[in-house]
Amino acid sequence: MEHPLECADSCSLAMSWFCNKKCRGWGLMKRTVVASGLRSVVLLLLFIYFVQDVTAEMGHQRISGSAGDVLEDNPVGRLKVFIYDIPSKYNTDWLKKDPRCLTHMFAVEEYLHDFLTESPVRTLNPEEADWFYTPVYTTCDLTPNGLPLPFKSPRVMRSAISYISSHWPYWNRTDGADHFFVVPHDFAACFHYQEEKAIERGILPLLKRATLIQTFGQNHHVCLKEDSIVIPPYAPPERMQTRLNPPSTPRSIFAYFRGLFYDPGNDPEGGYYARGARAAIWENFKDNPLFDISTEHPATYYEDMQRAIFCLCPLGWAPWSPRLVEGVIFGCIPVIIADDIVLPFADAIPWEKIGVFVEEKDVPILDKILCTINHEEVLEKQRLLANPAMKQAMLFPRPAKPGDAFHQILNGLARKLPHDPSIYLQPGQSFLNWTEGPPGDLYPWGNDL
């Protein structure tokens, strides 16, 4: 749809979305704003007035990703999972040492363990299992500030794999090809928070044949295997549910973002953090009245997202962010600025229909890109975001609920069945090299918690 005005600035374009039938022509608006100094302010006020019509009641509809209408599929009866009973030093001892592991954005590894333990897909008979799960917590070694230290993780994971391969026959039967592991850190099984170091390390060699469940997703990247299942990061469902605005709350913010633009502690010279995308957002739009952006994280953060049309989701050190989850939950259209990102449950969730993708190099014209999206497309994205199945698929609630992210993980595993017969090895055959990897990763790991 063509806009009725060829506007020279972003504020004018933004207004073109929300001009409903009560507005009699764009000439009136153009004549209203004569003084250039008042132009942005007046147009922003008009924008706030007209945007209230966008929050009208919307109907729900079925959602289809590339795998079809699968968000509401029930995985029970489609797969069986055997959980290895391994020593607590690999999992719950970490939690006893630091319960903050249950509240950070990597907490899915703990919660998935609990979920599978009680799930009807669990089998106690490994001979009938389709999948084998090793509950290793690789993001629960925290700094005083609550950030995970992944540097021990390769040794912890190697130790756990050595344990299951020496106590059960199933790992050696396939070299782990029918096993899955949860690796929710920034760059997953590359086990480093800086991309350059993660690429240098690569995926832990012993996991080459296993299926990885990870938050990191980027095409053509050494830290993502083709058969990995990309999941959303953990965001506390209860906290978000208690902060919901009334449905009639108008969306009076055009574009919203809270977070770092620079990371002087880890990137003192600038330009490396977020590949410069966040810095470009700040430098180009810090004074633009359409953009509500700041490093300050207000107490009303969740409420503010519910008043925004667009929520910016730029990459940080890694391409993924909890803002993706928050945007979907709060009906704020995610603006995804992360080249080649692979999004959570991409075969089930139609991200192209609910979000806006902006290449990192195009950040300086972000205002123009957003303002050329027509009114009908905005409404359609909001209509899809309003679907309860969409929101449920992004959350890890306790107790679990049908269609939630736990069930989407199981659905993803079920869609990989049956296993190809070629994964089963001949006696004495193996594709793994237990001495491969950085020398520091090969040191034994024991009870050094």
From Swiss-Prot:
Residue stretches spanning the membrane: 32-52
Localization: Golgi apparatus membrane
GO molecular function annotations of the record: glucuronoxylan glucuronosyltransferase activity
InterPro entries per the UniProt record, alphabetical: Exostosin (IPR004263), Exostosin_GT47 (IPR040911)
Primary location recorded for the protein, binned into one broad class: Golgi
GO cellular component annotations of the record: Golgi membrane
Disulfide bonds: none
Domain of life: Eukaryota
Top-rank EC class of the record's enzyme: transferase
Cytoplasmic side: 1-31
Keyword annotations of the record: Cell wall biogenesis/degradation, Glycoprotein, Glycosyltransferase, Golgi apparatus, Membrane, Signal-anchor, Transferase, Transmembrane, Transmembrane helix
Segments on the Lumenal side according to the record's topology features: 53-449
Tissues with expression: Mostly expressed in newly formed or expanding tissues.
A Gene Ontology BP annotation from the UniProt entry: plant-type secondary cell wall biogenesis
Glycosylation sites: 172, 433
Bilayer topology annotation: Single-pass type II membrane protein
EC number: 2.4.-.-
Effect of inactivating the gene: No visible phenotype and no significant change in monosaccharide composition of the cell walls.
Pfam (any one): Exostosin_GT47
Similarity comment text for this entry: Belongs to the glycosyltransferase 47 family.
Biological role: Involved in the synthesis of glucuronoxylan hemicellulose in secondary cell walls.
Protein name as annotated: Probable glucuronosyltransferase 47 A
Origin species: Physcomitrium patens (Spreading-leaved earth moss)
UniProt gene name: GT47A
